[in-house]
Design a protein with these regions (language model features):
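N-terminal, post-signal peptide beta-strand-biased segments of exported outer-membrane/organellar beta-barrel
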Residues: 2-103
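Residue-level marker of intrinsically disordered, low-complexity segments enriched
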Residues: 1-2, 10, 143, 187
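Outer-membrane beta-barrel porins/channels
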Residues: 21-23, 55, 82-393
Length: 393
C-alpha cells in the first residue's frame, strides 16, 4: 500500500493553495519527507479571489470593485535519503504568508484647515491598499526510530523583502461637526498615509512525530510550528513618523494529520490545524504612537477527503475544508468570516519516475463587516488552481 499512499497524497497536496487564518496563504508541508529515495518537485498555483466592499459606517467604497487582486504561488521541494533511518529535505514557497488588498478610493468624513477649533468638516477620499508577500522555507529532517515511529524536526525561515501599505488616517482625531477633539474616537479621513517596508527575516523551530503502518497506508502525524517575530524597517509619509519599525508575527501552529487505507486503492485523509493569530497582530507607527491595524482571530480549520487510484497511471482526490471565523469586526486586510472549500485533485504518471498533479479548489468566504471602516463584504469567493511536477531519482 505504500506506493498507493504516496501517489494519492501527491494529488491531494496539489489542491492546497490558499488558507484562511491571519495572513496564511500556503502552510508548510512535511509530507515530502515520507517519499522513497531522492525526490524533487515544483508546483505553481493561481489564486483568484472575488471580494466586493459596499458602504458602511459613513464610508463609501468604489462600486463593483474587486478589492482582492489575484496572485500566484510557486512551491518546490527536494528530499534525499541519507540512510535507512535519516531523510533530509528543503521545502520552499514564494508566498507562505501575505496580503494583497486594494479597496481603491474610500470616501468619508474628514477635516480641513489648521489644527484648531476653526477646522471645518469636509468629505475626503483616501485609499486602503496592502501588498506584502512573505516567502517561507523549511529545512527539515525525518529520523526513523523504528518500523512505526519517526521523529521530524527542522527550522522554518520567513522573510519580508519590500511591500507597501496605504491607509486613510485621522491625524488629530477632531470632531467633523465642531472641530473639537473627538471624544468618541470616530475615524476620519484627513490624509492617506503610506508605509514602505524594507527587508527582514525570522526563524522558528518545527518539531513533530509520526506513526505509520505501511501495510494499511496508515500515517498519523502531529507537527508544531513555533512563533516567528518580525520587526520590519519602515519608511513612511503622510501624517506619520518618517522612519520606524513595523511589528508583525507569524503565530505558532499545530497540525494533526492522518491518512489510512479504507479499501483497495482507496485512501481516507484529513487534518485539524490550530494557529495562533489573536496574539499576533500587525502594529505600525503613527504620530500618535504605535497603532494596531489588524484584528486577526485564532485559526481552527479542518480537512476531510478521499483519494482513489483508478489505474497504474491515474489517481484522484476529493476533499472538503472548513475554517471557522467571525466576520463581525474583521480586519480590513482579511475581510471575511468562515471558509468552506471543495477541492479536486488528480495525478497522472508520465513514466515510472515522473508524475504531474493538478488541483482545483472553489472556496466560499463568509460575510464580513470590517472593524475600522465598516466595509460590508458579501458573497465572497476564491478560485484556486495548481499544477505540480514530481520526479524521482
Amino acid at each position: 500500500m505504500r506506493v498507493i499512499q504516496t501517489a494519492l497524497m501527491l494529488c491531494v497536496a496539489s489542491t492546497q493553495l490558499c488558507n484562511a487564518a491571519g495572513l496564511e496563504r500556503r502552510n508548510i508541508d512535511t509530507d515530502f519527507l515520507f517519499a522513497d529515495g531522492m525526490v524533487v518537485d515544483l508546483g505553481v498555483g493561481s489564486v483568484s479571489p472575488s471580494f466586493t466592499a459596499t458602504q458602511g459606517g459613513g464610508f463609501a467604497f468604489e462600486s463593483g470593485k474587486n478589492v482582492a487582486p489575484s496572485f500566484s504561488i510557486t512551491t518546490g521541494s527536494f528530499k534525499s535519503e541519507i540512510s535507512d533511518k535519516l531523510d533530509l529535505g528543503i521545502w520552499h514557497t514564494t508566498s507562505g504568508n501575505g496580503v494583497n488588498i486594494d479597496y481603491g478610493s474610500v470616501t468619508g468624513p474628514g477635516m480641513t484647515g489648521a489644527m484648531n477649533s476653526s477646522m471645518t468638516a469636509v468629505t475626503n477620499s483616501g485609499r486602503i491598499k496592502a501588498d506584502v508577500s512573505l516567502p517561507s522555507t523549511l529545512l527539515a529532517a525525518k529520523y526513523q526510530m523504528n518500523d512505526n515511529w519517526s521523529l521530524i524536526g527542522g527550522m522554518k525561515y520567513v522573510s519580508v523583502s519590500g511591500g507597501q501599505l496605504m491607509l486613510p488616517m485621522d491625524i488629530d482625531g477632531r470632531d467633523p461637526a465642531t472641530g473639537a477633539i473627538n471624544p468618541n474616537g470616530d475615524l476620519l479621513i484627513d490624509t492617506t498615509s503610506v508605509w514602505n517596508f524594507g527587508s527582514t527575516q525570522g526563524t522558528g523551530a518545527v518539531l513533530g512525530f509520526a506513526y505509520e503502518r505501511p501495510d494499511i497506508a496508515l500515517r498519523v502525524s502531529i507537527i508544531n510550528e513555533a512563533k516567528i517575530d518580525l520587526s520590519v524597517p519602515t519608511t513612511s509619509g503622510g501624517g506619520v513618523a518618517a522612519n520606524s519599525n513595523s511589528e508583525a508575527s507569524i503565530g505558532d501552529a499545530t497540525t494533526l494529520a492522518f491518512q489510512t487505507g479504507i479499501a483497495e486503492n482507496t485512501l481516507l485523509f484529513g487534518s485539524v490545524r490550530r494557529s495562533n493569530w489573536a496574539n499576533n497582530q500587525i502594529t505600525i507607527q503613527t504620530l500618535g504612537g504605535p497603532a494596531t491595524i489588524t484584528d486577526f482571530v485564532d485559526g481552527k480549520n479542518y480537512t476531510l477527503g478521499i483519494g482513489r487510484k483508478f489505474s497504474d497511471k491515474l489517481s484522484g482526490s476529493l476533499s472538503y475544508y472548513y475554517s471557522d471565523g467571525d466576520g463581525d469586526g474583521a480586519s480590513e486586510l482579511s475581510p471575511y468570516g468562515d471558509t468552506k472549500t471543495v477541492s479536486l485533485g488528480a495525478k497522472y504518471s508520465i513514466n515510472d519516475n515522473t508524475d504531474v498533479s493538478f488541483g482545483l479548489s472553489e472556496s466560499e468566504r463568509g460575510d464580513a463587516t470590517t472593524g475600522n471602516f465598516a466595509a460590508k463584504l458579501t458573497g465572497s469567493s476564491v478560485t484556486s488552481f495548481g499544477v505540480k511536477l514530481t520526479h524521482r531519482y
